[in-house]
Amino acid sequence: MKMKLSFRWYGEDDPISLQYISQIPGMRSIVSAVYDVKPGEVWSEESIKKLKDDCDKNGLVFDVVESIPVHEDIKLGRGDVDKLLDVYCENIRRCAKYGVKCVTYNFMPVFDWTRTQLDKLADDGSTSLVMYWEQMKGLDPLKDDIHLP
């Protein structure tokens, strides 16, 4: 088995277009997700198909989903967990229908990737995620409805 080159794409708002990604030698696979749906809601087939079609138009394959967000109530074992798990499973089935072969998952306790800023500028001009403790320390995930960037 060979390692497959894949590239993360954040959808139409990503400053790097699929056209640019397709120019990377050996790049065939896109890792993406439906970003405009809250955790615990079903992804529309239209949104998934659009991702696939956009990739196809650029000679790329949308076959990896970077995490269908896990609702906090699943992690905390509260609320209507069975319904939320059904929604999660339905999202997996819908992705499979449109050719997705791999769904990464993130069951990090309480918060997903903990960060407070998505574009921290480094000295070399690159950007990365960053978490500032001062912005996080007053949050209580058991009491507050918290959404990080």
Residue ranges of each PLM-predicted region?
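Active-site mouth loops of central-metabolism enzymes
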Residues: 2-14, 72-86
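Hydrophobic faces of well-ordered beta-strands that scaffold small-molecule active sites
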Residues: 3-8, 28-32, 62-66, 103-105
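Active-site-proximal loop/turn and secondary-structure-junction residues that shape catalytic pockets
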Residues: 11-13, 36, 68-69, 107-111
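Short, acidic/polar
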Residues: 11-23, 51, 83-93
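Conserved, mostly hydrophobic/aromatic
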Residues: 21, 30-32, 55, 95
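Structural motif
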Residues: 24-25, 98
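Glycine-rich, proline-tolerant flexible connector loops at the mouths of alpha/beta enzymes
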Residues: 33-49, 111
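Active-site acidic/histidine proton-transfer and metal-coordination neighborhood
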Residues: 74-149
